[in-house]
Amino acid sequence: YRNQLVLDLSNPKVQDYVFGVVDNILTENPGVAYFKWDCNSPITNIYSPYAKDKQGQLYVDHVRGIYNVLKRIKDKYPDVPMMLCSGGGARCDYEALKYFTEFWCSDNTDPVERIYIQWGFSQFFPAKAMAAHVTSWNKNTSVKFRTDVAAMCKLGFDIGLQELSDDELAYCQQAIANWKRLQPAIMDGDQYRLVSPYETNHAAVEYVDKSKTMAVLFAYDLAPRFQEKLHAVKLQGLDPDKRYLVKEINLMPGTESKFAQNEKIYTGDYLMKIGLDVFTYLHNMSKIIELKAL
């Protein structure tokens, strides 16, 4: 299977070997600022000469051996961010969060599918644990849509810059700057799943920072039906007594917002009880709305 055999990490000598390989790479290349740990082969021939008569607990011992290696690496290189790649298929768990800064949720980076993946994944892990990259998958969708979907988590890019037009490149640069500015809400704030893609033809997710002075709403139109009823999205987690400036961000160069409530001021109470009209009848469209307390 994949012309690979899985190393027996229940064996301490194998643990030493694996740690040594990674340690040598990082020692010889002190400029390494980030690396990912991939998991590409299942165990298809489970057996360990080291375990002898304890084969029944081999799966557990194997995983504990992996954690031991990861702990040693993290202890020696605490400042090097690590991604647990190939994270789908039950490879993500809370113990691994001790050693990895993020998970790769799935190799499926189609932005439409990612909305569902990220919605489900967020039931268990925070946005800062979910690596989400803009790629060339599903070029029927715009670079804006792909970027706006990835920005809902830990934003990254796996795309050739030569594929982007000047406007698309400028948009991505603007989106990155906005994402960095909104990190207190997206990465460290409270998440509210407002409109489920599993129950509607749209999706909406909101993040609010701890001080309730900054919030960001991600809204997506997936496949709306003809003349379906579009409902306002009622926000959550705001301070009802605060006044918030509502502004659409991440607009393509040369375009203007068509969001009717753009650059208007509302109380948190209004936004949570009445809401914002962010959805449209268009397919695969997105809006990112920033809310700033005044």
Question: What are these language model-derived features?
Answer:
Residues I25, I73-K74, E206-K210, L235-G237, ...:
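A general structural signal for short secondary-structure junctions and capping/turn motifs
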Residues A223-L294:
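C-terminal beta-sandwich/jelly-roll accessory domains of carbohydrate-active enzymes
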Residues Y1-K144, K154-I159, E163-D166:
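Active-site neighborhood of glycoside hydrolase catalytic domains
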